[in-house]
Amino acid sequence: MTGVQTTAAAPPQASPRVKRYLPWVVATALFMEQLDSTIVNTAVPAMAAGFGVTPLSLKAVVASYILSLAVGIPVSGWMADRYGTRRVFAWAVGLFTLASALCGLAPNVPMLIAARVLQGLGAAMMMPVGRLAVIRTFPKTELLAAMNFVIIPALIGPLLGPTVGGLIVHWLSWRDIFFVNVPVGLAAQWLIHRYMPDYRGEATRPLDLVGLVLFGAGTALLSWLLEIFGEHRLDLGAGVALLALALCLLAAYGVHAQRSEFPLLRLVLFRVRTFRVAVVGGFVTRLGIGVMPFLLPLLYQVGLGLPAWQSGLLMMPAAAAAMGMKLIATRVLAVFGYRRVLMANTLMIGVTMALFSRVGPATPLALIVALGLCMGFFNSLQFTSMNSMAYADIEPADSSMASTIASSMQQLSMSFGLASGSLVAAWYLGAVPQTDRAAVVSALHHAFLALAALTALSALAFRGLKPGDGDQVAGRGEPAG
């Protein structure tokens, strides 16, 4: 998934040395980004204790990173075309590394959130541009092997992140989870300047500044409103006025995108039914799925009183099951088809999320592990299905923009889901201190049930698919015609 607009030119002849080491360069950056995105969740209770705040109030530390990813991804393509892949990739890794150090040094929550925004902006440019360099370097006959090597860290990072985070917090300090990125980032910079090719677009499209302001301001304001709604920091009148402003900004972007020759996101692609169903259905589904990696460590540490390292270990089964599902997902789709898989699997995710509402201090660890395995198994099948379905009927010339839209919507839905899930938990917790374990467990149980219901209802969105949709992608036979 990339936000880069590639040219139609064939890849240039890269040297054997570049081909040998470029996948390592991109994989190193991806590992750093994926590790950081999962390592933070386990450390939230320790951060809260260090800053003297409640764990739920730190949702913005996670949401700000995801939101800046959503806003920054569409700009990455323009940056690479204008300034070149080597320079932009080096900037992105440098910004991510610097922001990681600033996170570790942050004296208060606002500074930590600001540093996380910078981290997200670096990550938003880092991976799309890295993938573009790989695509432009390798011919089609070698591209699959190169891309498979590059995405391995995307699978390993979520597996190691919670455990590494838990161990670092337990034996060192939560600040050290950010300092881990510094030596990796410095090593990546050395590799970039030695082995990263420098590609530029043949014809740079103008940057849609108006669209960027409208889309960025609207989504940021809406996410912020969801974040603070449960904290009662705004009266009803001000909240309604700001909500109306956020919706007006997004509506204005919709009008602007229809009229602009080079919009930030080409909304006309939503006329493609399979793309529309996959992205919209996936948006609603991820509202529930995206918040679980944040709420589960709170349940384990704050609610059940488990140490950070044990909480991290309990997150590993989901990542392991997700990797296992990757081996059979293609076969499942080939046998049952996209429509049946997405509808049934979405319901199973909802059921699994609801079952977490039964987890309490007396629940055997084996049962918690089993639920984690189920969650990872179903989530992996869902992401594989939605991500591939989105491009089933997209023309090759539109694939880059379609990927940009899908990537931005994915991050945006996770940001909104995190804010919404935390809002539900805070709403049920009320004025009860978050040191009251029984109250925290009860509030989180209510959040799980609400998110489970929302996720299950999102299965209805996939009814918009036809039985034969995606059959060619799934390898179920020749397309009808």
Model feature map: region roles:
Residues 1-18, 464-481:
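Intrinsic disorder in cytosolic terminal tails and internal cytosolic loops
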Residues 33-37, 68, 90, 103, ...:
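Alpha-helical transmembrane segments of multi-pass membrane transport proteins
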Residues 70-71, 101, 155, 159, ...:
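Hydrophobic/small/kink-forming positions within alpha-helical transmembrane segments
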Residues 73-210:
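Helix-loop-helix hairpins in multi-pass membrane proteins, especially solute transporters
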Residues 104-111, 193-196, 226-232, 254-258, ...:
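Transmembrane helix-loop junctions and nearby membrane-interface residues
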Residues 170-281, 306-307, 314, 451-452:
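Hydrophobic transmembrane-helix bundles of small-molecule transporters
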